[in-house]
Amino acid sequence: MQLYNTLTRKKEKFIPQREGKASVYVCGITAYDLCHLGHARSSVAFDVLVRYLRHTGLDVTFVRNFTDVDDKIIKRAGETGLTSTEVAEKYMAAFHEDMDRLGCLRADIEPRCTQHIGEMIALCEDLISKGKAYSTASGDVYFRVRSFASYGKLSGRDVDDMRSGARVAPGEEKEDPLDFALWKSAKPGEPYWESPWGNGRPGWHIECSAMSEKHLPLPLDIHGGGQDLVFPHHENEIAQTEAATGKEFARYWVHNGFVQVNAEKMSKSLGNFSTIRDILQGYLPETLRYFLLTKHYRSPIDFTFDGMDEAEKNLRRIYQTLNLVENELQKTKWSAAPLPEEVLSEMDETERAWNEAMEDDLNTAAALGHIFGLVRLVNRIIEDKTMRKSAQARDALLRMQSMMARWGAVLGLFTRQPAEFLREMRDCRAARRDVDTARVETLLLERQEARKAKDFERSDAIREELARMGVEVQDTPAGAAWDIA
């Protein structure tokens, strides 16, 4: 498997340090608000990474933290009358609810900052003792950026260039404008902990250094997060951890691209964000997950409702094919006629191409394309009156089910019972278009009675009324079925 390593700026073969095992640390949310689509994208991207590593046979330990003390949490507490702890608990629970709905596996370990204050203080003390950090008269602790010779290696920034634009805010006691806070002295009304430098709380960057080292051996195999974390957060993590331990912090640095709206990054600060819950009022969670996987995880993805509709259409087609396959396999009589050799070889080639796409830096966009190739092939078999009767066709359909189950387990897709999922999607699309499903069912019953009575004029009139509502009717041996046109 090849992974793009932000540190080396190239794809590299992924070789875990401990045979048969892999460690993955991903920076989690700051728990002060509901998650937006940027959070969904990061969670889905790293969920697929972890699933794929496990698919290859590795024993993966996945750690993702929660930042549960931060300026934003303190501010939200002041706005709502809740304590900082209550704010963090509320939004950590909301995160789990949202990601559970999106089918993201929970991390094996979910450390919280407030549960690791001792480790953070110890790391600060270690850095001070090594001359890499210093405390101030007011009780703040800062990291000496220039004491770490390779500062900037992840982001590709030059220290002297950064220095020219750096400023010291009033009241700060930095030796150098580039230095960043490891420990912040307590302000009135804020949560605090006792420390050798007085009451205070940790800075953001020290948190992940302390928690990752606590729960995983160094160097980490993979450290991940959104592209916005490359600088300063991940750059500062490297400086702290490597200055303190003398060890490499992580071998592979993996970063997902932004979700964009009108070519701008989606973020709370820009005010152009939609929460996951906003989107899931109109679409099924699996549709959103599918949409997020239609682009390579490192590329930006433009969020549009047209894009969501396209994802929904494609996901529906895949499930319709899975439903067809399920029904076709109910047959008990099959002929001895062979399938054309090119059909069997096309299935082999599709499986090879899917594996190749995923091995190439988790190219889910290409992998979904190969799944569509399989869907087209299977529909060709089912629609051909000769091929569909073949016992080899049965074997091909069973193989398709097996392939889709394996691939779906990696992508977190296609795991639902097809007929049930299609009904759910139909009702979701109906709700989005304000179609009264109870009225539809009533009209279908009336149409059924009209057909029994051979009142075809009335039956056709009802079909036309349903069509005006945006509903199409399919008459099947099992009775009338309906869907949104």
Swiss-Prot record:
It is found in: Cytoplasm. GO terms for molecular function: ATP binding; cysteine-tRNA ligase activity; zinc ion binding. It is an enzyme of class 6 (ligase). A motif ('HIGH' region) lies at residues 29-39. Keywords: Aminoacyl-tRNA synthetase, ATP-binding, Cytoplasm, Ligase, Metal-binding, Nucleotide-binding, Protein biosynthesis, Zinc. GO terms for cellular component: cytosol. Zn(2+) binds at C27, C208, H233, E237. Its EC number is 6.1.1.16. A motif ('KMSKS' region) lies at residues 265-269. Belongs to the class-I aminoacyl-tRNA synthetase family. This is Cysteine--tRNA ligase. The gene is cysS.
